[in-house]
A protein has these predicted regions:
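C-terminal segment of classical bacterial N-terminal signal peptides
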Residues: 31-40
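Internal, hydrophobic beta-strand segments that form the core of beta-sheet-rich folds
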Residues: 161, 201-216
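N-terminal secretory signal peptides that target proteins for export/translocation
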Residues: 1-17
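Sec-dependent N-terminal signal peptides
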Residues: 18-30
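A short, structured loop/turn motif at beta-sheet edges
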Residues: 149, 164-165, 198-203, 229
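Short beta-strand elements
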Residues: 217-229
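N-terminal "mature-chain" segments and other terminal, solvent-exposed stretches
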Residues: 42-151, 155-171
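Extracellular carbohydrate recognition and processing domains
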Residues: 170-197
Length: 229
């Protein structure tokens, strides 16, 4: 007869511990796989068309943001990714709380695209003047906003930079903006469309959208680079 192997109490306890560790590891991996993309802890929203600066950078380079060719192909996005990648991963979190409707006080000149250097400076690179990629639009266009959290809106304000302003060399100031649309309330949803009619604009401009959310005093400040055809 073969030698009979004796299983001790210590062996049994070790087996149970190993199995428990394996189960916990598998559960942890499953939970990590369910988390959203890196850096985005809370869903909010942004203008997706014409794409905001950081949304456009995430859209074009989010799957390959370490590609060195970006430095030549898309230099403004390159400097933004180098400054703080979380500004792109969190493309839907560019807001300030408690502005009380006094936006120039909360967001000084030269800091409009970062929402007054909100979120500890995460979005500061978006204030840089330069040749940001543009979206071609006509004099009549639609601003499309994605509100993942369905906050709703008390109102939207849509501005276009004055003719003659050069976003490739000039920091954006409130005095550079011309109001082209003001809306009423929007019920909570995930997708909003804001029709805009303009005249007299040509070439490169910034469309600046202010979104006053309804769920609290939370305001989004969003720069989209466009080319009027």
């Amino acid at each position: 007869m073969g030698k009979r192997e004796t299983v001790t109490c210590h062996d049994h306890v070790s087996f149970v511990r190993r199995r428990s560790t394996l189960v916990l590891s598998l559960l942890a991996a499953l939970l990590l796989s369910l988390l959203p993309w890196s850096g985005t802890a809370v869903a909010h929203g942004s203008v997706v068309d014409p794409a905001t600066r950081n949304y456009g950078c995430w859209l074009r380079w989010g799957s390959n943001h370490l590609d060195p060719s970006m430095a030549q192909q898309d230099p403004m996005c390159w400097q933004a990714w180098q400054a703080d990648p979380n500004g792109m991963w969190n493309w839907n979190g560019l807001y300030r709380n408690g502005s009380g409707g006094n936006f120039p006080a909360a967001v000084p000149d030269g800091q409009l695209c970062s929402g007054g250097r909100t979120e500890g400076g995460r979005y500061n690179s978006l204030d840089a003047a330069g040749a940001w990629k543009t979206t071609d639009i006509n004099s009549d266009f639609t601003v499309k906003l994605y509100d993942q959290a369905s906050h709703g809106a008390d109102y939207f304000l849509v501005y276009v930079t004055r003719q003659g302003f050069d976003p490739t060399t000039q920091p954006l100031r409130w005095s550079d903006l011309q109001l082209v649309a003001r809306t009423g309330r929007y019920a909570p949803s995930q997708n909003y469309s804001i029709p805009v009619s303009t005249s007299g604009y040509s070439g490169r401009h910034i469309v600046y959208t202010v979104w006053q959310a309804s769920h609290m005093d939370q305001t989004y400040f969003l720069c989209s680079d466009v080319n009027f055809r």
